[in-house]
């Protein structure tokens, strides 16, 4: 398939580009910077990748990306923290996602893959994540709130019969990132503390970015209609997380 991919220079996007090329697909990257795409190509040892420069919040700049493509994978998102980042988080994750999803349905792409977040489902009814989970009425932070806004659009389009595929990743970790992921920054902060300040209840879900890239690639099957999949990975409670971090860092 000829596949448009947003967020192509990000952590998930870079690994997804690699997986798409390995699987015989033809990716078209949507980027803000050619130089960062060059860095991703070098890091993952990829051939030259076709690309379109633009701004995800501009519907007009997205149209050339989607033209002549068969499918789209929407990985672009802002996962920053702090009050100063809130306007950008809302603009990219909510407005940008609406733009990609609606324009992709207008272009009759199949499938239309939306990378959401496990955080939009938390806490799950009954304590278990399933494909029947509703969007949480109490988002845990502004990031989750913005991703939920995007997922409301995705679910609406699913209800209308459009071939939208919703993917829920949890904490994404792994190698080969041109930057430093939010999960990696969080782990680094913990490791710098004299005593790891973890609560004694609850825990964390994490998975390898390469597994997510594989899932996204394998979802590129047309004529299967709306779908939802969780990529939740492995659960460690906080005491187990502390033991694990100590074991790998000494």
Residue ranges of predicted features:
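N-terminal Rossmann NAD(P)H-binding glycine-rich loop of SDR-like oxidoreductase domains
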Residues: 3-25
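Glycine/proline-rich active-site loop of Rossmann-fold NAD(P)-dependent oxidoreductases
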Residues: 174-185, 219-229
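Conserved beta-loop-beta element that borders a ligand/cofactor-binding pocket
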Residues: 152-176
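Mid/C-terminal beta-alpha module of Rossmann-like enzyme folds, strongest
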Residues: 215-250
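Conserved Rossmann-fold NAD(P)-dependent oxidoreductase catalytic core, especially the SDR/UDP-sugar
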Residues: 95-143, 165
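A conserved pocket-lining segment of Rossmann-fold NAD(P)-dependent short-chain dehydrogenase/reductase
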Residues: 186-207, 211, 215-218
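NAD(P)H-binding glycine-rich loop region in Rossmannoid oxidoreductase-like domains
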Residues: 44-45, 49-95, 103
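Glycine-rich "substrate-gating" loop/helix at the edge of Rossmann-like oxidoreductase active sites
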Residues: 140-141, 170-180, 198-210
């Amino acid at each position: 398939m000829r596949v448009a991919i947003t967020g192509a220079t990000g952590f998930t996007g870079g690994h997804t580009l690699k997986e798409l090329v390995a699987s015989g697909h033809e990716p078209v990257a949507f980027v803000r910077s050619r130089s960062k795409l060059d860095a991703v190509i070098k890091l993952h040892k990829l051939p030259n990748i076709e690309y379109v420069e633009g701004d995800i919040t501009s519907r007009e700049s997205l149209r050339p990306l989607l033209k002549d493509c068969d499918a789209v994978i929407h990985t672009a998102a802002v996962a920053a923290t702090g009050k100063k980042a809130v306007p950008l988080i809302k603009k990219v994750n909510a407005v940008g996602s609406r733009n990609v999803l609606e324009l992709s349905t207008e272009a009759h792409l199949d499938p239309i893959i939306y990378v959401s977040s496990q955080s939009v489902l938390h806490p799950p009814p009954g304590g278990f994540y399933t494909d029947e989970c509703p969007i949480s009425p109490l988002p845990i932070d502004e990031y989750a709130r913005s991703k939920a806004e995007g997922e409301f659009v995705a679910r609406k389009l699913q209800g209308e019969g459009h071939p939208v595929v919703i993917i829920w990743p949890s904490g994404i970790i792994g190698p080969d990132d041109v930057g430093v992921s939010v999960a990696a920054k969080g782990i680094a902060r913990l490791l710098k503390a004299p005593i790891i300040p973890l609560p004694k209840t609850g825990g964390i879900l994490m998975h390898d970015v390469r597994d997510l890239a594989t899932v996204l690639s394998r979802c590129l099957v047309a004529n299967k209609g709306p779908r939802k999949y969780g990529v939740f990975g492995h659960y460690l409670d906080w005491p187990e997380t502390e033991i694990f971090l100590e074991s790998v860092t000494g």
